[in-house]
Amino acid sequence: MIAILTDKPNVGREIARVVGAHKKENGYMTGGGYMVTWTFGNMLSLAMPKDSGKARVEWEDFPLVPPPYLTVKNMKTDTGWNPDINAVLQLKVIAKVFDACDTIIAATDASREGEMLFRHLYRFLGCKQPCLRLWISSLTDEAILEGMANLRPCHQFDNLFLAADSRNRADWIDRKSVV
């Protein structure tokens, strides 16, 4: 089986239709040798200082450096900041799909952000399967089929990921620098 990950449910459904994955499951579609699933945008974020057990940031802690790990995106609730339950549930679906497949296709947006979204999930879930990149800028049947015929190894997009990840870490530092 081959997993395809998109960053939006509607994109996932469109790609699933074209590749023949017509059977609807909870959070993914399957068929034609594919399992197509999706995220709801960025479901992961760089960890906050509190995630490492630090209750509050002191002046001595500056400059802050982003921790090298990711956490599930938090949402503001009545009881404070808690993991986004929809993200947690869909991450379980994505993990199940990835575990059932021997190849993963990154079909997130053809951009730095789309590449970072995929790489963060791939790393967060501890994936070891080979990954390929579907690079398309249109959801027409022709564009999807041409993209599927011209998949490229993910490592060819390493610099795109590094650019987005560097910007993400710089944004983290900028947000955390305000006391």
What role is predicted for each listed range?
Residues M1-S177:
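Intrinsically disordered, low-complexity regulatory segments
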